[in-house]
């Protein structure tokens, strides 16, 4: 039995190539009511969690069975894995928090590679208290000669106590910690040549032991 969390691509192996994916951030809100004047009243305030689905390319039958077995492990209680946006092919860089404005969420990073460009749409991840924080840049910047960059912004906002000065971060094609959505794995269908349509849904977890 593997030690969780596992890196999804490493654990599933070289056959785990994307055919299609969704990769999205939940709203954390619900429509509670709509007034006679057409105003939509939204309620909620729950955690905004990343979620998505992954469909793998068609596999030879023996490879599909191997994939099924590994996914069975990931569907069990207590299993978790790291997954990222597979359309992001830019690699990762590391750095540290330099400063964070608690009121606005605007922050600076240090210890980055000079000249590296952080783009809106890149991802930011860091570990704290047994958890993995995962965010997406809405405002980026170019790292200066001293390895510093700011003023940066991300969604969702940092949770209280998570982002602190000197904490190490990963920038770019970073990954979040996730679990399988129960009942949402499709093992695919097979013809004489291959098995296709193997799909599963996942959702970010903030628990240390999901």
Where in this protein do the model-derived segments appear?
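Extracellular/virion structural assembly segments
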Residues: 1-210
């Amino acid at each position: 039995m593997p030690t969780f969390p596992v890196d999804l691509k490493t654990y599933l192996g070289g056959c785990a190539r994307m055919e299609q994916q969704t990769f999205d951030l939940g709203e954390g809100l619900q429509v509670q009511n709509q007034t006679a004047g057409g105003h939509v009243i939204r309620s909620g305030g729950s955690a905004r969690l990343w979620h998505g689905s992954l469909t793998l390319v068609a596999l030879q039958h023996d490879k599909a069975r191997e994939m099924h077995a590994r996914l069975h492990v990931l569907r069990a209680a207590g299993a978790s894995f790291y997954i990222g946006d597979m359309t992001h092919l830019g690699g990762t860089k590391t750095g540290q928090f330099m400063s964070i404005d608690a009121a606005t969420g605007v922050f600076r990073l240090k210890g980055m590679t000079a000249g590296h460009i952080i783009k809106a749409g890149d991802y930011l991840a860091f570990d704290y208290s047994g958890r993995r924080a995962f965010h997406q840049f809405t405002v980026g910047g170019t790292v200066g000669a001293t390895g510093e960059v700011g003023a940066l912004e991300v969604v969702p906002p940092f949770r209280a106590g998570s982002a602190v000065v000197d904490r190490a971060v990963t920038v770019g094609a970073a990954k979040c910690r996730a679990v399988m959505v129960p009942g949402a794995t499709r093992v695919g269908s097979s013809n004489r040549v291959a098995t296709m349509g193997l799909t599963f849904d996942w959702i970010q977890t903030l628990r240390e032991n999901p």
